[in-house]
Amino acid sequence: MACQIWRWGNESLHFLPEKALWRETDRVLMVADLHLGKAEVFQANGVPMPSYGDAGTLNPLLDLCHAWQPKLLILLGDLIHARLGLTEALRDVLRALPVLCGCEMVLIGGNHDRDSWLEGLPQQPSQSLGDLWLSHIPETPPDPNQLNVCGHLHPVASVQSRSDRLRLPCFAFDPKGPRLVIPAFGQLTGGHDCGERYQQWLVADDAIVPWLASFPNKRGRQTA
């Protein structure tokens, strides 16, 4: 699968078509917005929805960890959808997840994780990683030279022709942040159009496709 390498200052980041971010320097894999247990939350509220959504999220995550062999997996918030969806079966899976992924895991707490306790996976606050400021919701980094990397927004881009219109997940860069928003990883997540102020890289099939590539960009730049 074709990834896109993007540089921010001294940081070299890989946009992966699996909707994940790879930091080669210390072999860190980042994903956001898995929203596990979402189907069970809908079912509890009387909305019929099949329960296989979590497998459609977790199996690709395990495949990704097997392929890239990260030393650390950072979950940028909203690991679960709501406490109501935290079944015992899901708790068992989450307890085993570090072993299944074969690496250490860190959860930066998101708004959907609030009030939920996950054994062995305490929620951590926003934090620095090199020149990056990692958070769930968009934040202003404490150091103006840092790049905020976050989730929460579930960014998608609209691609339109005369006869068709597609909405594709994307990596979205806002130079005014400066901020990089990564796409939602979960199978049962929607998306929000990130708008023209963002430079966008579309997740299209098994490739990353630069979009609006002429967007002004002071420090971030794409490389082949």
Language model segments and positions:
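Extended recognition/assembly regions associated with phosphoester-bond processing machinery
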Residues: M1-L76, H81-A224
